[in-house]
């Protein structure tokens, strides 16, 4: 069976000394160790699945935040992903799914 996503971890927000950008996060993808490896993932979708309380509006109890990998960060295989909405601070260190589509092969 083909897998449709790779695992990753949110490292933190993109930031400088004075400013942090909560809608752009640094993500370390499992098995990616160089800048050349991480260029394969440019343009891929990222989803963060977080648990929320169940309600009539949300019967599953899961909230999914979608983002897109926009650029590499450094030389160790970390990438930057831009999310549609700001990620909550609780997402630091949380696992994410890096979808293997859209394909650019």
Swiss-Prot record:
Protein family (similarity comment):
Belongs to the eukaryotic ribosomal protein eL33 family.
Function noted in UniProt: The protein was found to bind to both initiator and elongator tRNAs and consequently was assigned to the P site or P and A site.
A single GO CC term, please? cytosolic large ribosomal subunit
Q: Which UniProt keywords apply?
A: Ribonucleoprotein, Ribosomal protein, RNA-binding, tRNA-binding
> Source organism's superkingdom?
Eukaryota
Q: Which InterPro entries match?
A: Ribosomal_eL33 (IPR001780), Ribosomal_eL33_sf (IPR038661), Transl_B-barrel_sf (IPR009000)
Q: What is this protein called?
A: Large ribosomal subunit protein eL33
Annotated source species? Dictyostelium discoideum (Social amoeba)
Example GO molecular function: structural constituent of ribosome
List this protein's GO terms for biological process. Answer: cytoplasmic translation; ribosomal large subunit biogenesis; translation
